[in-house]
Swiss-Prot record:
Superkingdom field: Bacteria
Positions that bind Zn(2+) 2: C170, C173, C192, C195
Gene Ontology terms for molecular function: ATP binding; heat shock protein binding; unfolded protein binding; zinc ion binding
Annotated organism of origin: Paraburkholderia xenovorans (strain LB400)
Gene3D superfamilies assigned to the protein according to its UniProt record, in alphabetical order: DnaJ domain, Heat shock protein DnaJ, cysteine-rich domain, Urease metallochaperone UreE, N-terminal domain
Family of the protein in this entry: Belongs to the DnaJ family.
tRNA processing found in the keyword field: no
Zinc finger (CR-type): 140-218
PROSITE patterns assigned: DNAJ_1, DNAJ_2, ZF_CR
GO BP term, example: response to heat
Domain comment (free text): The J domain is necessary and sufficient to stimulate DnaK ATPase activity. Zinc center 1 plays an important role in the autonomous, DnaK-independent chaperone activity of DnaJ. Zinc center 2 is essential for interaction with DnaK and for DnaJ activity.
Name assigned to this protein: Chaperone protein DnaJ
InterPro entries in the record: DnaJ (IPR012724), DnaJ_C (IPR002939), DnaJ_domain (IPR001623), DnaJ_domain_CS (IPR018253), HSP40/DnaJ_pept-bd (IPR008971), HSP_DnaJ_Cys-rich_dom (IPR001305), HSP_DnaJ_Cys-rich_dom_sf (IPR036410), J_dom_sf (IPR036869)
Presence of keyword RNA-binding: no
Length: 380
């Protein structure tokens, strides 16, 4: 039987906000929760369906994969999310059921309701923020980063037990990780107070990790920064997050890239912009000027009579996009610079030049003539 659309299951629109999805889930979870419908297989089936839909849509990465590829993007048979089954819903939804049923419900979910053996948990993902230069972003490079993280204990190999021993099945919950308790007319499951939901306990803890199965360590990792990466993008390093629990897979490391402000260029996608001052003589007479680019120097011709603020486009002098062989453009915004701190001879030359312009009429300054024509009525 084909799976229903996750948005349809929760009764929300595809553009629903996180809060709308959460509210819809809480309402349906309350309605179909097994503790409210003992022995009702239909309610249990609806609850599993609602739980699975919320698990996918409450996680931004899983939701993006589902929006793009549908169920195939999150199919557990293809290594996607959702493979934990009914017993593991508390890991994703403990906050929800903590609100609905109180702290006891989170433990009941963690215990898994009749499963045999301890629950397996995937390790947490890690985030690492990294600042690079515009040049590094444009060309790409390989680097190393040092990331503080929990790693599996090398003495007990992550079991938490002293070498030569092993964790034992919890006698209080018989390995289920939960115990059933009654609160008023509710009969709910609660996290086992002895094993804290793992289903096992360690009679002889490892002396190195003190039973945790993991130790804090700083890892040195190789990171490849791809050419064309932009500010805010993330690089995924699979399996370099925190170790899993009870043999679960490790999480992933996400390296978030931030690009430092450049002293010359401003980036706009694959294009670059720069402000360039030019002498007023070059603007008036025209000429060839050189500009910097990320690949060296380039030159272009400024036509005579160039005005301040004029923009020139140099094709292909920007940045090649991520996984693209086509580079953006460089936009040079020229600013005509007025000379300062003139000597007397220089001032005299400019006065003579100004006199010659006046004698030549307004054709030398068309913008000034147009402006004065528009405002002359204010001076009448």
């Amino acid at each position: 039987m084909a799976k229903r659309d996750y948005y349809e299951v929760l009764g929300v629109a595809k553009n629903a906000s996180d809060d709308e999805i959460k509210k819809a889930y809480r309402k349906l979870a309350m309605k179909h929760h097994p503790d409210r419908n003992p022995g009702n297989k239909d309610a249990e089936g609806h609850f599993k369906e609602v739980k699975e839909a919320y698990e996918m849509l409450s996680d931004s990465q899983k939701r993006a994969a589902y929006d793009q590829y549908g169920h195939a993007g999150v199919d557990p048979n293809m290594g996607g999310a959702g493979a934990q089954g009914f017993g593991g819903f508390a890991d994703a939804f403990g906050d929800i059921f903590g609100d609905i049923f109180g702290q006891a419900a989170g433990g009941a979910a963690r215990g898994g309701g009749g499963r045999a053996g301890p629950q397996v948990y995937r390790g947490a993902d890690l985030r690492y923020s990294m600042e690079i230069t515009l040049e590094q972003a444009a060309h790409g490079y390989d680097t190393q980063i040092r990331v503080p993280s929990w790693v599996s204990c090398e003495v007990c190999h992550g079991s938490g037990a002293k070498p030569g021993t092993k964790p034992e099945t919890c006698p209080t919950c018989s390995g289920s990780g939960s115990v059933r308790m009654s609160q008023g007319f509710f009969s709910i499951q609660q996290t086992c107070p002895k094993c804290h939901g793992t289903g096992t306990y360690i009679p002889d803890p490892c002396g190195h990790c003190h039973g945790a199965g993991k130790v804090k360590e700083t890892k040195t990792l190789e990171v490849k920064i791809p050419a064309g990466i932009d500010d805010g993008m993330r690089i995924r390093s699979a399996g370099n997050g925190e170790p899993g629990i009870n043999g679960g897979p490790s999480g992933d490391l996400y390296v978030e890239i931030h690009i430092k402000q450049h002293s010359v260029f401003e980036r706009d996608g694959d294009d670059l912009h720069c402000q360039m001052p030019i002498p007023f003589t070059t603007a008036a007479l025209g000429g060839e000027i050189e500009v910097p680019t990320l690949a060296g120097r380039a030159s272009f011709t400024v036509p005579e009579g160039t005005q301040s603020g004029k923009t020139f486009r140099l094709r292909g002098k920007g940045i090649k996009g991520l996984r693209s062989s086509i580079a953006g453009d460089l936009y040079v915004h020229v600013q005509v610079e007025t000379p300062v701190k003139l000597t007397e001879p220089q001032r005299d030359l400019l006065k003579q030049f100004e006199k010659a312009l006046v004698e030549g009429g307004s054709r030398h300054s068309p913008q000034s003539k147009s402006w004065f024509d528009r405002v002359k009525s204010f001076f009448d």
